[in-house]
Amino acid sequence: MIEETLLEAEEKMEKAVVVAKEDFAAIRTGRAHPAMFNKIVAEYYGAPTPINQLASFSVPEPRMAVVTPFDKTALRNIEQAIRDSDLGVNPSNDGNIIRVTFPELTEERRREYIKVAKAKGEDAKVSIRSVRRKAKDSIDKMVKDGEVGEDEGRRAEKELDDTTAKYVAQVDELLKHKEAELLEV
């Protein structure tokens, strides 16, 4: 019973780290990266659709991305979605592909993106701590109900704390790398 609770908590913490990784990947740096387009949604036959399902992405140069729609009729909508996104870019289309050139980030923009990254990192840590709290409550209830002994409960809480610390450290490490990437000129 306790092992199941600990495993479930660890899985949820792992998911929080994965979400943080995806969020960090979507934050723009000085370089073009296909993951930057993951959260952008375009209108496609009347339905909002993520553009990573409507096109392929390549990065021929460090500050340029090329978006190739699978369906040419979606070209204008994809271009508009990229233009309206918070990437701060002005895409150009030649009728077949969309070229997205990323201007050099100003120091002010870099600082803004670092703040965004820190907020996303904090969200991930709050999520991890929330999972810990729920698992701890579950363990405390098992001890109180007599399903497991107090020693077993303390051991499980120690293991839970170690797991929590491990995943919080992973988020901190991801954040540190993202900050370094953003400050790199």
Swiss-Prot record:
This is Ribosome-recycling factor. CDD domains: RRF. HAMAP family: RRF. The gene is frr. Responsible for the release of ribosomes from messenger RNA at the termination of protein biosynthesis. May increase the efficiency of translation by recycling ribosomes from one round of translation to another. It is found in: Cytoplasm. Belongs to the RRF family. The keyword Nucleus does not apply.
